[in-house]
């Protein structure tokens, strides 16, 4: 997958209105990326919980348990075999694995997600730096505008 091409814009050449629009766009992108990080962390936590649950299966043959039908409805059940688990590998596909294989799968997923979180965090940091630059340019333009207004006011007073 190719990265989107970054466009370099001379912030000094933009008007205050354009700077405001760019600032709002960058803030929205930061918000979107932050939400992505939260979703990735949520997914990572699910894999961590799954790994821990698989670890808790050892020595549970014949034990009674509750089997979830939905997030709020459970049926009583009994563990017949605790040597194999069904692992959701994505898009509705499940693979039967040994507990250790399932835990390794979860570890790999957590590692992959952590790498993605780091990449997204790097992008957020870059966007924040861009946002700081935009705000600084806007503030300097506002200061310059105020100076010009003050000079014009002084000139008008002197002409009278």
UniProtKB/Swiss-Prot annotation:
Highest taxon above the source species: Eukaryota
Similarity remark: Belongs to the prefoldin subunit alpha family.
Pfam annotation, one family: Prefoldin
Keyword annotations of the record: Chaperone
InterPro entries: PFD_alpha_archaea, Prefoldin, Prefoldin_subunit_alpha
Biological process (GO), any one: protein folding
UniProt subunit comment: Heterohexamer of two PFD-alpha type and four PFD-beta type subunits.
A GO molecular function held by the record: unfolded protein binding
Protein known as: Probable prefoldin subunit 5
Source organism per UniProt: Dictyostelium discoideum (Social amoeba)
Function of the molecule: Binds specifically to cytosolic chaperonin (c-CPN) and transfers target proteins to it. Binds to nascent polypeptide chain and promotes folding in an environment in which there are many competing pathways for nonnative proteins.
């Amino acid at each position: 997958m190719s990265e989107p091409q970054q466009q370099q814009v001379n912030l000094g050449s933009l008007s205050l209105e354009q700077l405001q629009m760019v600032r709002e766009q960058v803030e929205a992108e930061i918000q979107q990326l932050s939400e992505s990080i939260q979703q990735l962390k949520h997914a990572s936590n699910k894999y961590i919980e799954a790994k821990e649950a698989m670890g808790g299966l050892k020595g549970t043959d014949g034990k009674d348990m509750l089997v979830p039908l939905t997030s709020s409805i459970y049926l009583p059940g009994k563990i017949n075999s605790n040597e194999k688990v069904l692992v959701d590998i994505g898009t509705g596909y499940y693979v039967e694995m040994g507990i250790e294989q399932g835990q390794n799968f979860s570890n790999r997923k957590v590692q992959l997600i952590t790498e993605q979180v780091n990449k997204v965090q790097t992008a957020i940091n870059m966007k924040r730096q861009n946002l700081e630059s935009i705000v600084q340019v806007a503030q300097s333009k506002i200061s310059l505008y105020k100076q010009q207004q003050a000079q014009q006011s002084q000139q008008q007073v002197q002409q009278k």
